[in-house]
């Protein structure tokens, strides 16, 4: 769906027209083989085509420590997605579900995320597989995958806390 598409039977759009609460700085651009939403996969595959993440020059020093083989969580802005749908029918069968209960790219803050391993790094370019976004998608952030990352900073008391949260 593009932002200009009609909604499907059973779907509901918001009429919210307030101002945003926060700003986002794009740190790069993602280059993929997909130019149209109908071509783009619903989920990235580890054996999918190689895509290129271009990190803008300002942010190049922030890539220090990212090497070939690094497993990253890639955050991107799904800039061609609708942002007003509250109820969606992912199967196009009229059976609506709340936007927050599905992984649709159509959401108030269209942030996409994929876990991908760096095949190769060449300066400001990361070549990876496993993305599910359009060519030219803005890059929001890169983080090491939680499963492989051990914090470098000293532990804090909350790191060891277990049990029920206070109410």
From Swiss-Prot:
This is S-adenosyl-L-methionine-binding protein RPA0152. Pfam families: TrmO_N (PF01980). Belongs to the tRNA methyltransferase O family. Residues 148-167 are annotated as: Disordered. It comes from Rhodopseudomonas palustris (strain ATCC BAA-98 / CGA009). It comes from the Bacteria. S-adenosyl-L-methionine binds at residues 41-43, 79-80, 103, 113, 132-137. Keywords: S-adenosyl-L-methionine. InterPro entries: TrmO-like_N (IPR023370), YaeB-like (IPR040372), YaeB-like_sf (IPR036413), YaeB_N_sf (IPR036414). CDD domains: UPF0066. Homodimer. Residues 24-154 form the TsaA-like domain.
């Amino acid at each position: 769906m593009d932002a200009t598409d009609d909604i499907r039977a059973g779907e509901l759009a918001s009429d919210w027209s307030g101002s945003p609460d926060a700003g986002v700085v794009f740190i790069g651009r993602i280059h993929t083989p997909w130019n149209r939403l109908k071509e783009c996969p619903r989920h990235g595959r580890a054996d999918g085509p190689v895509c290129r993440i271009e990190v803008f020059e300002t942010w190049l020093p922030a890539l220090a420590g990212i090497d070939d083989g690094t497993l990253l969580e890639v955050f991107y802005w799904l800039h061609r997605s609708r942002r007003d749908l509250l109820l969606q029918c992912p199967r196009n069968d009229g059976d609506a579900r709340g936007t927050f209960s599905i992984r649709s790219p159509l959401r108030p803050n269209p942030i996409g995320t994929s876990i991908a391993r760096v095949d190769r790094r060449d300066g400001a370019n990361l070549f990876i597989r496993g993305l599910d976004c359009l060519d030219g998608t803005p890059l929001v952030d890169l983080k090491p995958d939680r499963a492989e990352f051990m914090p470098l900073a000293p532990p804090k008391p909350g790191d060891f806390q277990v049990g029920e949260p206070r109410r």
